Structure formats: structure tokens, C-alpha cells
Amino acid sequence: MKQEKTLLLQEVEDKISAAQGFILLRYLRFTAAYSREFRNSLSGVSAEFEVLKKRIFFKAIEAAGLEVDCSDTDGHLGVVFSCGDPVSAAKQVLDFNKQHKDSLVFLAGRMDNASLSGAEVEAVAKLPSLKELRQQVVGLFAAPMSQVVGIMNSVLSGVISCVDQKAGKN
């Protein structure tokens, strides 16, 4: 039994070190169907959900030299490890939580080498994603260019209209 726990601890330590970030969750009223649906939704954003024993997770955090506020860890503990953008994973958790009537509670998280409280993780999840921000910036640059093109197009069509009218009079 001791060897199994050691292997599990090593596996969790490896996941923590390989992940870009993680989100600590408490799950409530979580059926097998919800769990499968949740895991499938996370796979689209390069994240995975693990149900872990608290003691093993906290030992792995300690071994990794990380600090995470784990003061409110009553109930079942689940961790979302994000190998991609941790904000996208947080958004996915928030979306799933809205669809399934608050079956998940944000406890804490770690993103970009910063420890976050549950409320902070939830606030980050409500922000626009990196992809959405890029689209907004491109839109900001593209809007003036499209206006210039529209003005030039209307000037050219006005010139052509004048030439057509002059040609029609002769």
C-alpha cells in the first residue's frame, strides 16, 4: 500500500510540474455522467480533471515548493490540470458550472506562477480569453482601415459617376 501511495504522489507531482496551471475544486452532486461530460469538455482546452485525496495533493504541492491557499477544503477535492492556457480551462469550468447548477466550487488555483484564491480564479474565468483579446485588437486595427477603404471607394465612385454624367450629356 505504501508503494502505491508513493507512486500516486510521484504521478501528482509530475502533473503539477508539467501543467501550466491548475484549479482546485470542490464538487457537489457530481454523477458519473457529469464527470464524463466534464472531462470531455476539458479535453478540448488541453486540460484534465482528477479526483485526488487531499493529503496526497497537499504533499505534492509541498514537494513542488508551491504555495496554494488550501484553508477551505471540506468535501470532495478535484483538480483541473491545464497543459494549455489555464484561463481557457477556468472558463470551461465556469461554463460547465453554469450549465449544471453550481455543482463545482472554485477553492484555489495557480496560473502564471501566481497562487489565486477561488474568487480570483472565478474572476479570471470571466475575463475574455487570449483568443478573444487578439480578435478585439485586430478589430481595432482593422476598423480604421476599412473606413479609409470605404471613403476611398465612395470618392472613386463619385468621380466615375461625374464622368458618366458628363459623357451622357455629349
UniProtKB/Swiss-Prot annotation:
Keywords: Ribonucleoprotein, Ribosomal protein, RNA-binding, rRNA-binding
Keyword Lipid biosynthesis included in the entry's annotation: no
Gene3D superfamilies, sorted: 3.30.70.1730, 6.10.250.290
Pfam family of the protein (one): Ribosomal_L10
Single biological process term from Gene Ontology: translation
Ribonucleoprotein found in the keyword field: yes
Gene Ontology molecular function terms on file: large ribosomal subunit rRNA binding
GO cellular component: ribonucleoprotein complex; ribosome
Alphabetical list of InterPro entries matching this protein: Ribosomal_uL10, Ribosomal_uL10-like_sf, Ribosomal_uL10_bac, Ribosomal_uL10_bac_type
Function: Forms part of the ribosomal stalk, playing a central role in the interaction of the ribosome with GTP-bound translation factors.
Assembly notes: Part of the ribosomal stalk of the 50S ribosomal subunit. The N-terminus interacts with L11 and the large rRNA to form the base of the stalk. The C-terminus forms an elongated spine to which L12 dimers bind in a sequential fashion forming a multimeric L10(L12)X complex.
Family: Belongs to the universal ribosomal protein uL10 family.
Protein's UniProt name: Large ribosomal subunit protein uL10
Gene name linked to the record: rplJ
